Amino acid sequence: DNGKKISIKYQINDNSYQINQSITLNEGFEDTDFINLKWKNKPYHQELNTNNEKNQSTINYLDENDNFDYLDYPSTEDESIEISNPIKWISFKQQYFISSIISNDLFYDSKLFSLHEKGDEFVKDFIIESKIKLINNSINLDYYFGPNDYKILKEISTDFDKNIYLGFETIGVRTFNKYVLIPIFNFLKNFTESYGLIILLMVIVIRFIITPFTYKSHISMAKMKVLNPEIQAIREKHEGDMQKSQAETMELYQKTGVSPLGGCLPILFQMPILISVFYFIPNMIEFRGQSFLWANDLSTYDSILRLPFTIPFYGSHVSLFTILMAISIMLMNKTNMQMQASMEGPMKYFQYFIPIMMLFFFNSFSSGLTYYYFLTNIATYGQMNIFKKFVDESKIKDEIELNKKKNVNSKKSSFQIRLDEAMKAKQNKNKK
């Protein structure tokens, strides 16, 4: 009309998930600076766990300053945002697949909509409204329609691999996954095609690396076990006076050279690894569709029994890997209780509460993840029992007694001095 003509060309590359689109306007559009873009996509439900798939589906985007952001993941409400900064790329992300649009010339005045779908046929309803600036009356766009495969995504565009959620950047979880777990995972894939065996090998490698920390934790707990009778005697001596009991206990720790946190700190060192795996296994597409033992798909939950009803917070299926994980946690807690000073009050029952809570929490999680945690707990349990055979508690007791003699006239620590001052202040206040 009026001599106006739009030319649209597509280029499909062999062995690639990318499509290039070029749009050219002829001279009849000489007053046109921008093209309006509107893209709608309603991805079909693809995975076994519909709720989890919806929770993993959202819109991701990267602005011109390389700031990555996204709409709220697990929301059951309609989400939308207006973005003033120009954008480099936008992705409709599902759990294991994405549809993305990438522009070298940036998207302007973008509006993103993620609309909740109540049924099970579609995951969500995604909409993009944006403007693209014309350069010489043309624009070039790249589309990516493919898997959330880290190896592929990192080659597509700047920070495009962030479409795979590998954990928090701020506490180093994503960094650990990128530079430690993914290289280990890719290396182990060279030796076997069984992803169940790859998970087993990952556990062995990681347990080997952190064995010195596990051993240090065991030694610290063994010292606390030897010291426990004296701690109990102090508690009985100052029953009803917690401050005096704490002050004398701290003095005992100082004289014996035993740290009450010695057994905790090495264990805390392992927490980032467990958290990293929590994001790693469920988000790596390599596990999708991979069977192992009774699990048909390591990317979703395993089910050995379908229930004719739904248990609140549990579900309508029974995951055997989750049960095994819960049992392994109980074994770990029992061993730790034997090594540590006896617990009192509600803490005594905490060791039973945690496995039950994990049973409910992890029942619908990836079977690959619960299998990994089960193996990790069993490996740790085995290590601790091996350490028991090599740790001589009588030698530890002799070492503690020797430290007592060395430190009999040692000065109080600054913490002990402050604690004594606080006790005296409280006693003076009570006298008044």
Q: Could you describe each region identified by the protein language model?
A:
Residues 278-328:
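Conserved catalytic motifs of ABC-family nucleotide-binding domains
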